[in-house]
Design a protein with these regions (language model features):
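Pyridoxal 5′-phosphate
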Residues: 4-7, 23-461
Length: 461
């Protein structure tokens, strides 16, 4: 099953609050300290911090590192580091040597580790045999690279709901489609836009449709395979921003039928500073190098412009690469490949449903959404507390409850502003703040952590 399929099957439902003494979906005891939250909560509650359980144990390489007592509900910004990543880095550190630049044993080992990492990440993403897997710094870097590789005269189609990383790198004449009201409407909008762009042409101009797999604001999943099919019907290509989808569900380029995929290591339980652009080789090999310098060249002559650029990933990876980042990311990819991802997904969906149910019941809290309330989504929820400044709420959650989450417009200003306006209409509240809060969960998240947030939201100031 592809990531989208998994996303589709995992619809959030509204469960009953857990009974005291019961187990959460990961088999951890559900906190009995926090009472189920409802709109009719008594006026006074104990504000003392609730003890937080450790991350669920027993998954070995996919245990996440963290600081005891700190509740990380900000996985969508940066996920904690998985043990697999930390171990891979620790193992390689004594072998520290140059990559692609030395004949010594250390250097050869590092070069091999780097190229193996490329292979493993490519396998994880289900690349086709002739696709390139290019290491970048992050998703932003990957999408900027793809923008630079657009053939001349190429057009881009995207949605106003995208993260800035998938809005801003594209040419100024990019078609930015309005935020659709449903997954089906998104597919229809792409179809209509491409028909319009192709009208009166011979259909050969390059067009790229670039869309996210899961929204960083709402967690909602986009109909990736259907969008890619719509693009291909019109002879266009499809780029998937999988920064938020890949940490939660399988992303397989071949199965989804997409042409390019971009991910960030730091959202995939690996360290900062590594990302990937994977996909069709032809545009990438024809484009000027994204970075110029050592490693991107085949030959350099005496004259300034006498340069033969390399083909393949090296063309866009000038300079000494981020070996440890690549190896750490590959280790996480391997660990994720060898576990039952459907089970992980189901566990996360149950926790997400608990979080959303609690948020829906908390006083004055309004959730943000683009599609219907039951549309498939990954472990991300954005919301506002009516009458409260979101930055102040976030600061209070951090200071008083040791809960880390995100506030603001989440680098998706057009979407976040629109959803805030819609939330005001839907809730009938005139006192919604101009920015939002976002809670996001993943591998190390527990019911107790979610309950702590719900308890904090239910506690009067
Ligand atoms: C959907 C989406 N795309 C792209 C990005 C950019 O990722 P990075 O900051 O790792 O480049 C993010 C980051 O939050 C994101 O959520």
């Amino acid at each position: 099953m592809t990531g989208l399929g998994a996303c589709r099957t995992g619809q959030a439902r509204t469960p009953s609050p857990p009974a005291p003494g019961s187990l959460d979906p990961g088999g951890n005891p559900v906190s009995t300290i926090v009472a189920p939250v409802s709109r009719t909560l008594p006026a006074r509650r104990v504000a003392a911090p609730v003890p937080v359980d450790p991350a669920p144990a027993g998954r070995g390489p996919l245990d996440v590192l963290g600081v005891p007592g700190q509740v990380n509900l900000d996985y969508a910004a940066t996920a904690p580091c998985a043990r697999a990543a930390a171990d891979a880095v620790a193992e390689l550190l004594p072998w520290y040597g140059s990559v692609h630049r030395g004949a010594g044993a250390l250097s050869r080992r590092c070069t091999l580790a780097y190229e193996r990492a490329r292979q493993r990440v490519g396998d994880f993403l289900g690349v086709r045999p002739d696709d390139h897997v290019i290491f970048t710094r992050n998703t932003t870097d990957a999408l900027n690279l793809l923008a630079r590789a657009l053939p001349s005269g190429g057009k881009v189609v995207t949605f106003a709901s995208e993260h800035h990383a998938n809005l801003l790198p594209w040419p100024v004449d990019t078609v930015r489609l309005p935020v659709p009201g449903s997954a089906d409407a998104a597919v229809r909008a792409v179809d209509a836009a491409l028909r319009e762009l192709r009208r009166g042409t011979d259909g050969s101009a390059p067009i790229l449709v670039a869309v996210t797999g899961a929204s960083n604001v709402t967690g909602e999943c986009w109909p990736v395979a259907d969008l890619a099919r719509a693009a291909h019907r019109h002879g266009a290509r499809f780029a998937l921003d999988a920064a938020q989808l890949a940490p939660h569900a399988e992303v397989d380029i071949t199965a989804l039928g997409v042409d390019y995929v971009a991910v960030s290591g730091h959202k995939l339980y690996a360290p900062f500073g590594v990302g990937v652009l994977a996909g069709r080789a032809d545009w990438l090999d024809a484009a000027p190098p994204y970075l110029v310098g050592g490693g991107a060249t085949r030959t350099v002559g005496a004259a300034t412009h006498d340069v033969g650029w390399a083909d393949g990933p090296g063309r866009h990876e000038a300079g000494t690469p981020n070996l440890l980042g690549a190896v750490a990311l590959a280790a996480v990819c391997e660990a994720l490949t060898s576990v039952d991802r459907a089970a992980l997904h189901a566990r996360e969906q149950a926790l997400l449903a608990h979080l959303r149910a609690g948020i829906a019941a908390a006083p004055d809290v309004v959730e943000l959404r683009t599609f219907g309330p039951d549309s498939p989504r990954v472990g991300i929820v954005s919301f506002v507390v009516a009458g409260r400044d979101s930055a102040q709420v976030a600061a209070e959650l951090a200071g008083r409850w040791q809960i880390g989450l995100r506030d603001g417009l989440f680098c998706a200003h057009p979407l976040a502003r629109r959803l805030l306006a819609e939330a005001a209409v839907r809730s009938g509240r005139a006192d919604l703040p101009p920015t939002a809060l976002r809670a996001s969960i993943g591998l190390g998240s527990t019911t107790q952590q979610v309950d702590r947030l719900l308890s904090a939201l239910a506690t009067p100031r």
